[in-house]
Every structure is written in C-alpha cells, then in structure tokens.
C-alpha cells in the first residue's frame, strides 16, 4: 500500500495567482505514483478547492474524498482509491483551542484493503503553527493528544494500525519539537526511521515557489522538516519505504514536498 501526503499551500496571494498550475502538478504526481491514499493540508476551500481546477474535481476519476459534506471548511482532506480499499468508518474534526479558520484539524478513516481483507486507519492532520508563546507549544501537544484519543478509540474498536500524515509544525525550527515529541511519547513511530528503505531529506522550504507568466516555477530546495508520517501499532505493518519526493515539479507545486510511504499490512 502507498500513501501520498503533502501540505499543498493554501495561498492567500493576489486573486488569480492562488493555484495556477499547482493543482495540476499535484494531480500529475499522484497519478504517476498511484497511492491508495492522498492526505493534504492547507487545502483551502477558497483556493485549492475552487477555480478552474479544484483539487477534488481533478482527482475524482480515481479518488474519493471522505466526508465531502465538510469540503467547504475542511483544510485537511483525505482521499482514497475505491478500487483498492473500502471505508469501514470515517470522520473529521477541527482541533479545540487555538485555531485559524478551523484549518488545524484531522480527517480520518478506517479502511479495508480489498486484496487482503486487512484493516488500516489513515489520518490527515495539521497542527497549530504559531511560535509566540509557551501556550503555542502547548497547543501542538494538545493537538497530538487529540490524535492519541482517536488512535486509542480506533485500536479498541478495530484493532488495526493507524498511520498519521501531516504538517505538525514541529521540528528543529522556531516552533520547537513539542507536537512531534508528544506523538512519540504516545506511542507513534516515525516511519522515516523504521522503514527498510528511507530518506533523510528535509520536507519544507521557507520560500515559496515563484509565480511567473501564469504559473508557479523554480521552487527552492527544502531546508527544514516539519512534515511527518507516523504509525501507531507499527508492529502490525511492514514499513517498506519512506521518501520525500524532490523534483522540479514537486518544488513548484508547494513550499512543502510530498512524503511517500510504502507499506504492507501484517
């Protein structure tokens, strides 16, 4: 099985420059990689989900969004391939506490792999971003604890592994490591470090790609890591490969590069 995760940059720049070619670039990468699951962050209803090529529209020939009734406000959507997995249960919730436009949230699903009958839970999430006070750091830990509560509920009901994908706004940055650290304390494993084949690359750039002549080009190389894929009940899966997709196309699509995780259910 395969997951594609990316913060696709909500972008509140001048109207007409919001998305341009970026959704198309993201679609091309997804259709080339062919993941079972696509997790997004900053999927802004007013930019990424609107205009001539809304992300949900250009993916719909191959992918279905869970809880589409929340599409008008869900910045962290989760899409799946119905030909390979089916939904057993799913949900969406914005985090309590500090939030902006309810963009810090989680979309989740429990899925059955059709070829094996085995279950896996997948979550797309985005933690609080500010770094102005100790309360901001505490908010990211609260975000992690909300995910922990969900993980324990799903484990009790379905007994399957959970894979959490997203921008935790945590790392060797001004935000600090709190959100990521809390996830590890809860019992999540960073798949970067448990995969048979792995990539130690950065995931995010502090500069945005350039808008020029109607499209985005020349994205910078990443220089920090705040995006992660983490597994709960990791012993129930075989982590085969983790990598950061760093190409001219991926760098032009967002300030965050896609994370790809290949795994098998045990």
Q: What is each PLM-predicted segment?
A:
Residues 108-110, 114-123, 136-165, 170-177:
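His/acidic metal-ligating clusters that form di-metal
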Residues 1, 36-37, 120, 161-163, ...:
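Short, Asp-centered acidic motifs that coordinate Mg2+ and/or phosphate
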Residues 19, 37-129, 241-243:
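Structured beta-strand-rich core segments of catalytic domains in phosphoester-bond hydrolases
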Residues 1-57, 74, 145, 264-266:
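N-terminal, active-site-proximal structural segment of metallo-dependent hydrolase catalytic domains
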Residues 5-24, 96-100, 128-139:
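Acidic/histidine-rich helix-loop elements
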Residues 152-163, 170-266:
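Metal-dependent phosphoester-hydrolase catalytic domains
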């Amino acid at each position: 099985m395969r997951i594609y995760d990316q913060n696709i940059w909500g972008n509140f720049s001048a109207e007409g420059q919001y998305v341009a070619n970026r959704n198309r670039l993201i679609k091309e990468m997804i259709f080339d990689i062919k993941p079972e699951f696509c997790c997004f962050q900053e999927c802004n209803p007013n930019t990424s989900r609107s205009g001539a090529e809304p992300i949900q529209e250009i993916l719909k020939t191959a992918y279905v969004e869970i809880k589409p009734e929340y599409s008008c406000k869900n910045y962290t959507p989760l899409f799946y391939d119905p030909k390979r997995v089916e939904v057993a249960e799913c949900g969406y919730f914005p985090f309590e506490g500090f939030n902006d436009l309810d963009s810090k949230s989680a979309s989740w699903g429990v899925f059955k792999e059709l070829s094996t009958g085995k279950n896996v839970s997948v979550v797309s999430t985005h933690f609080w971003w500010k770094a102005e006070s100790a309360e901001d750091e505490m908010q990211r830990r609260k975000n992690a604890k909300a995910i922990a509560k969900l993980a324990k509920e799903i484990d009790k009901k379905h007994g399957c592994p959970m894979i959490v994908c997203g921008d935790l706004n945590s790392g060797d940055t001004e935000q600090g490591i709190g959100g990521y650290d809390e996830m590890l304390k809860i019992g999540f494993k960073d798949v970067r470090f448990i995969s048979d084949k792995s990539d130690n690359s950065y995931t995010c750039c502090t500069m945005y790609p350039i808008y020029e002549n109607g499209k985005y080009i020349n994205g910078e190389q990443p220089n920090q890591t705040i995006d992660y894929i983490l597994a709960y009940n990791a012993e129930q899966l075989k982590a085969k490969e983790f990598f950061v997709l760093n190409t001219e196309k991926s760098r032009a699509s967002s300030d965050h590069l896609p994370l790809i995780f290949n795994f098998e259910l045990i």
